[in-house]
């Protein structure tokens, strides 16, 4: 019979995961190159080999001080990253786990500067060789997918890329917002239920990634328009109600809907304070 873990939904799952993963992460800190940062005076140092959330793990690598003062060979970056990833695979394997290499990917953030000093990210097609990792005791090597720095990847629900481009994230939010609007229009919800759906479903879906997003105000107001107009009709208002009334406080005769452009700023500020 196969030995199975406690499962993600069990009450003992978090404790079991902590007991298993803590020594693995401590070993990763000692064996991997990791990533290091310093403050401008170089009096404070921060080092991290990997960041983990449940069963999702991200590893990072750099040689901060040395690469500040000399040209960086991207092949060295790739080799350090390959080494750190293989270390994590070995740790998982020896502890009874398995890294699913088909789901792994990596970015190489390598800057190029023109004669005017303008920086651009090197395309992934120029960043060779590709990383290959072994899995378990099979002796076989798998090529890991390399993503271009402008290509977003979903991380814990947020679509992010090293270039900080938000096009894919906005596109995904637009799909969710338009789907909500269609469902509200075609539903048989009461006014109270439509009101609750706006705040408990749509609003929470939209603001989840706001602490780490930087969408323009114009984009966010265009994004929220279909859902807001559909909800207004369901709760008995005109879809062309003035914005001052839609987003105004109830104490002053407003409907108290939330402007996503304002909420993004609030969420970012709260994250900084925390």
Describe each model-derived feature in a short phrase.
Residues 2-37, 80-81, 165, 192-196, ...:
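Conserved pre-motif C helix in the palm subdomain of viral-like polymerases
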Residues 17-70:
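Active-site palm subdomain of RNA-directed nucleic acid polymerases
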Residues 223, 236-274:
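Extended C-terminal regions of large enzymes
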Residues 98-151:
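Short, conserved micro-motifs composed of acidic
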Residues 9, 21-24, 55, 92, ...:
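Mobile genetic element proteins and their domesticated derivatives, centered on retroelements
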Residues 42-43, 101-112, 220-228, 242-251:
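A glycine-rich phosphate-binding loop feature that marks nucleotide/adenosyl-phosphate handling sites
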Residues 71-96, 175-179:
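Inter-domain linker/hinge segments that demarcate the starts of reverse transcriptase
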Residues 133-217, 235, 266-274:
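Basic, alpha-helical interaction scaffolds
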């Amino acid at each position: 019979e196969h030995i199975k873990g406690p499962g993600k939904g069990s009450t003992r799952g978090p404790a079991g995961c902590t007991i298993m993963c803590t020594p693995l992460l401590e070993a990763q800190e000692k064996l991997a190159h990791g990533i290091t940062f310093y403050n401008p005076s170089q009096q404070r140092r921060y080092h991290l080999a990997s960041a983990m959330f449940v069963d999702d793990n991200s590893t990072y690598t750099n040689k901060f001080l040395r690469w500040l003062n000399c040209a960086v060979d991207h092949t060295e970056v790739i080799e350090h990253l390959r080494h750190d990833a293989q270390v994590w695979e070995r740790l998982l394997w020896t502890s009874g786990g398995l890294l699913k290499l088909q789901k792994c990917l990596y970015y190489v953030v390598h800057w190029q500067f023109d004669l005017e000093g303008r920086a651009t990210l090197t395309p992934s097609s120029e960043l060779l060789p590709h990383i290959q990792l072994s899995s378990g005791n099979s002796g076989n090597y798998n090529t890991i997918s390399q993503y271009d720095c402008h290509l977003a990847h979903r991380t814990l629900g947020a679509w992010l890329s090293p270039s900080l481009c938000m096009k894919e994230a906005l596109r995904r939010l637009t799909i969710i917002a338009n789907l909500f609007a269609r469902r509200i229009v075609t539903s048989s919800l009461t006014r109270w239920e439509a009101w609750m759906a706006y705040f408990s479903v749509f609003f929470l879906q939209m603001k989840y990634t706001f602490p780490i997003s930087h969408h323009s105000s114009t984009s966010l107001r265009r994004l929220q328009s279909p859902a807001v107009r559909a909800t207004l009709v369901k709760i008995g208002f005109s879809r062309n109600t003035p914005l001052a009334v839609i987003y105004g406080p109830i104490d002053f005769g407003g409907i108290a809907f939330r402007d996503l452009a304002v909420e993004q700023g609030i969420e970012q500020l709260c994250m900084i304070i925390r």
